Amino acid sequence: MNQKIFILFTLLVFFSACRSLHSVTNIGANDSFVLGNNRHGYFNVKLKNLSAHSIKVYQKTLTDSVHSFSVIKPKETVHVYADKNTALIIENKSEKQASVKLDVRGDVNLSMGYK
């Protein structure tokens, strides 16, 4: 019986871990980080600005339609919900490097890169 409980617990942890992504991402001066610029399902992000300056966050569809602009202040945390096939763009217009903490849930089959 204990072995069955252990196996069940291990499977639950494994499948839960596969649906989430945790990262601290550094974005260079005057650069952008793009999350999900590919075909994918819905996802949501808990994003914390770890920098000493504000960053801009917005979403862009695969057809280049842009929406949901937000300015995230230093140490501020926001929740962003992204539709299917929509990228999240984190833009650093500062002359200094920016850092963000990302907790992503949902479809995590997302492309990641710098623009």
Residue spans for each PLM region:
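Positively charged n-region of N-terminal signal peptides that target proteins for export
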Residues: 1-5
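C-terminal motif of bacterial Sec signal peptides marking the signal peptidase cleavage site
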Residues: 15-17
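Tight coil/turn sites that cap or link beta-strands
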Residues: 24-32, 36-40, 74-75, 83-85
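Structural beta-strand segments of beta-rich domains
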Residues: 41-45
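Short, surface-exposed beta-strand/strand-loop-strand elements in extracellular ectodomains
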Residues: 52-68
